[in-house]
């Protein structure tokens, strides 16, 4: 078994407190009262769902026939306040602030429609945003009430699926994130017998999920026909673009709150369970870390990696999926791969990229094997190009205003990328940002400012990078000891 955990981290915890809902009118108190508990991840979960979680944990085969009653006015209220307040409106044209006016009456009406079967899902509004390669990708914006109901249903279903999902799955799950996935991968490569890395890329995964097969997979756990009808409504709601409606025959709804959970359910059955069964029968060690549709596997033996890849292609076809042949790679990587290539005079092993970091075989100061992680070059260049364009737009804005903005950008960039070993790359990134700002300031006037004059300005506004993340193995094992990251 791999070093990554095989059970989810956030079990049902002790009841810490009953939350008092703020700002509700006295007349609505009994209807809107929210009796909640906190999970280990800090998620707010209605107390009534504790039994659902316990049943899901104790009986992995149970099909839940009565779940919709868990969607209460109080849960809808919590779901509303969990939404982004500045998000663009969908086809309904309703913003968060507008819906907040008369909120309690709106939620009681919505609750009634959901339980009577009168609730209708609206199509998502499609917008197009540029990609780094010059192409565009669609962005869906859901209607506000769809977001509220979906968030409530996700809260209910998470109580079941968080007991089912594998420990090596990290994407879009309560209490988990990208750096947890990166830590798990680092530890697996460093501590386990990994000589080959398989970098999987499923072609247009979110667009090719079979609705029929997805519902069949959900039905293995969910047997409440009302919840199933809600999910089918969202799947069939379609897309509205320039006033024209189009049907969606496959894929998860664009911009839908429930889409990440649906995609995780699909991959749990299609990839995670299948891989778990496959590696239990393997003769060598196999590790896997998955974040949404981005998965990295480590193999001890080349022949098993090649056989896994061949059988996976056939398996995915049964579910309407296929690998992107141009992006899926099997490469030598790891401690033993480095030694073998050095002995053959083949140079260093190839690198691979996962969650924005390029992973490289290297050595630490003592000459021992180390996985080096640096910001992916494509991501870095894309960010610099975005900053260049925005600096041009802000060319004549006050220096202090631009400085505040750049400081915020750099801090956010460091917050994700400032891992051990990546400081030289971040220092270079800051230097390039300084040059971009300097060139922009030079274009404001015919009088070219000097470096000596602007140096203190750059030093004041642009923070120096520092390591903000602990070493992965220390952080990984600390989580496991605290019980938030078990095997």
Show the residue positions of the predicted features.
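Non-catalytic terminal/accessory segments
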Residues: 1-487
């Amino acid at each position: 078994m791999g070093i990554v955990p095989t059970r989810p981290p956030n079990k049902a915890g002790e009841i810490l407190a009953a939350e008092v809902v703020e700002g509700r009118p006295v007349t609505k108190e009994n209807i809107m009262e929210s009796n909640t508990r906190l999970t280990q991840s800090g998620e707010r979960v209605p107390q009534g769902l504790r039994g659902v979680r316990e049943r899901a944990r104790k009986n992995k085969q149970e099909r839940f026939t009565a779940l919709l009653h868990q969607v209460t006015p109080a849960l809808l209220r919590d779901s509303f306040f969990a939404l982004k307040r500045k998000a663009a409106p969908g086809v309904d044209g309703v913003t968060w602030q507008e819906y907040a006016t008369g909120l309690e009456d709106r939620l009681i009406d919505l609750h009634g429609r959901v339980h009577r079967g009168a609730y209708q899902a609206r199509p998502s509004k499609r917008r197009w945003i540029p990609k780094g390669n010059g192409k565009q990708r669609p962005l869906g914006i859901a209607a506000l009430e769809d977001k509220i109901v979906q968030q409530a249903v996700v809260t209910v279903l998470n109580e079941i699926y968080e007991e089912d999902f594998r420990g090596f799955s990290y994407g879009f799950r309560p209490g988990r994130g990208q750096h947890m996935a990166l830590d798990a991968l680092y530890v697996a490569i460093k501590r386990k017998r990994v000589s080959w890395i398989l970098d999987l890329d499923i072609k247009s995964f979110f667009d090719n999920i079979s609705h029929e097969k997805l519902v069949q997979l959900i039905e293995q756990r969910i047997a409440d026909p009302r919840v199933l009808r809600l999910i089918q409504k969202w799947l069939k709601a379609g897309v509205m673009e320039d006033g024209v409606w189009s049907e969606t025959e496959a894929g998860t709804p664009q911009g839908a709150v429930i889409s990440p959970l649906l995609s995780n359910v699909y991959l749990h059955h299609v990839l995670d369970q299948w891989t778990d069964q496959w590696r239990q029968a393997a003769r060598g060690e196999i590790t896997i870390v998955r974040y949404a549709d981005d998965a990295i596997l480590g193999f001890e033996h080349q022949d098993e990696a090649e056989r896994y890849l061949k059988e996976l292609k056939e398996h995915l076809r049964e579910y309407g999926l296929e690998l992107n042949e141009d992006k899926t790679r099997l490469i030598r990587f790891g401690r033993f791969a480095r030694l073998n290539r050095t002995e053959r005079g083949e140079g260093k092993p190839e690198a691979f990229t996962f969650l924005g970091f390029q992973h490289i075989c290297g050595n630490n100061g003592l000459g021992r094997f180390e996985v080096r992680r640096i910001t992916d070059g494509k991501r870095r260049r894309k960010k610099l190009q975005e900053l260049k364009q925005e600096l041009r737009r802000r060319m004549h804005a006050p220096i202090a205003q631009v400085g505040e903005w750049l400081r915020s950008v750099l801090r956010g960039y460091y917050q994700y990328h400032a891992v051990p070993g990546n400081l030289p790359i971040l220092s270079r990134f800051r230097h390039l940002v300084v040059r971009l700002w300097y060139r922009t300031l030079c274009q404001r006037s015919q009088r070219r400012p000097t470096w000596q004059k602007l140096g203190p300005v750059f030093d004041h506004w642009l923070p120096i990078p520092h390591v903000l993340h602990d070493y992965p193995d220390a952080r990984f094992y600390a989580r496991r000891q605290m019980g938030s990251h078990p095997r």
